[in-house]
Amino acid sequence: MQQTVTYGAKWKQFLTIFTPIVITQLTLFSMTFFDTTMSGNYSNQALAGVAIGSSFWAPVNAAFSGLLMAITPIIAQLIGAKKEKQVKNTVHNGLYIALFLAFILILINFLVVPMILTHMPVTAEVADIARHFLNGICIGIPAFFISAILRSFIDSLGLTRVTMLITLCTVPFNIFLNYCFIFGNFGFPEMGGAGSGYATGITYWLVVLVSVILIQTQTRLRKFGVFKGLTALRFSKIKEIIGIGVPNGLTILFETSIFSAVTILMGAFGTETIAAHQSANSVCTLLYAFPLSVASTLTILGGYETGAKRLKDAKQYRHIGMAAAILIGCVNGAILFFFRDIIAGFYTNDPALSNLIMHFLVYAILFQFADAVLSPVLGALRGYKDVTVTSIVAFISYWLIGLPVGYGLSFTNLGPFGYWIGLSTGLFVAAFILSIRVRKTEQKLSFNTKDAEISN
């Protein structure tokens, strides 16, 4: 990364960082896509089981990753402020937190989740598939969190092409393992939907292996000496990471868990509706890679400019990110509307299920426009390390507004589609409030056009 002067130079740097991130995100989300489609091709019960299992894993995955991603703006600001020597300790303390969280999460999976599954409104077969799916995921939870720290470290330096290469190397391996474990090919046990969990868990370890190799062989990464001895646990650094990470993680948790809650509530409408909801939701997740990548890019660039005390440049990057996100939202909405029948065909050959999926996809268009506004705002706020209010806004918007609206509409002629209208309502409310917040945050940051000093 480097300082830029013109809008043209900023667009170029934005796209240089954004493009590898979006390829990485699309590839990562394709793992969920292939888990869903390959499980659906095995059976509707397998698809429903993976949907329920994912409804547990997705919010935890996203929330804990969001917590660990706190090192991205921290390191980006350190780089901008020319304090590179502090980077190694930041990464190490992030790894300490990651391993602790992994241990806690594995305990919860084996001690708490089975009890929850027995009380859910789904068949015993679907619950059993979900349980084994999550057990498979647990194999790779430590690796997943370690890789989240390493990926954040690499991205915060603006070296997003490296994480792209890591992901591109590992996802084909995941697809191959899905083929083996779900369908029992090449002498592997036929595990159905649960097999996709084991495939994903094993793949996470490959991600760590490839990450370590690249960090050790790339000069721009090796110079930080991340793997040259362990630094001491610093409670001040732990406090900084948690101070940013917890609100950030809660924001993501409130957003992803609301989708998981809706998946569980869909159980009242039957297995077929759960399967259709999960299929359409996996498409939305895939498309969400674009606005999410805009947010990640703004966190990196905004953090870098904030560390260098250049508020004007940080604001200009936010404007660029907003323009890019709105354009992406329009394109994604058009894809969902005009190609919904083709998309549904990827998931099932059942006409009734295909019709349900197409209906969900129409309502998903609303998500695209809400995310186009919300994602860049969240990314900018993370770059400024202003994340406390976002978690409060997320809880109110999603759980106190979005879910009640959706629940009420589900008793009308809209049925299960009412939940998706409720979800969209929550996203729009959050986007509106946080758009005001980011402007106020920028007003509070005092910068001198030359030396610039930030005051919070």
From Swiss-Prot:
Pfam families: MatE. It is a multi-pass membrane protein. It comes from the Bacteria. The chain crosses the membrane at residues 13-34, 54-76, 95-117, 132-154, 161-183, 193-215, 244-266, 286-308, 321-343, 358-380, 387-409, 414-436. Its main location: membrane. It is found in: Cell membrane. GO terms for biological process: monoatomic ion transport. Keywords: Antiport, Cell membrane, Ion transport, Membrane, Transmembrane, Transmembrane helix, Transport. CDD domains: MATE_NorM_like. GO terms for molecular function: antiporter activity; xenobiotic transmembrane transporter activity. GO terms for cellular component: plasma membrane. InterPro entries: MATE_fam (IPR002528), MATE_MdtK (IPR050222), MdtK-like (IPR048279). Belongs to the multi antimicrobial extrusion (MATE) (TC 2.A.66.1) family. Multidrug efflux pump. This is Probable multidrug resistance protein NorM. It comes from Listeria monocytogenes serovar 1/2a (strain ATCC BAA-679 / EGD-e). The gene is norM.
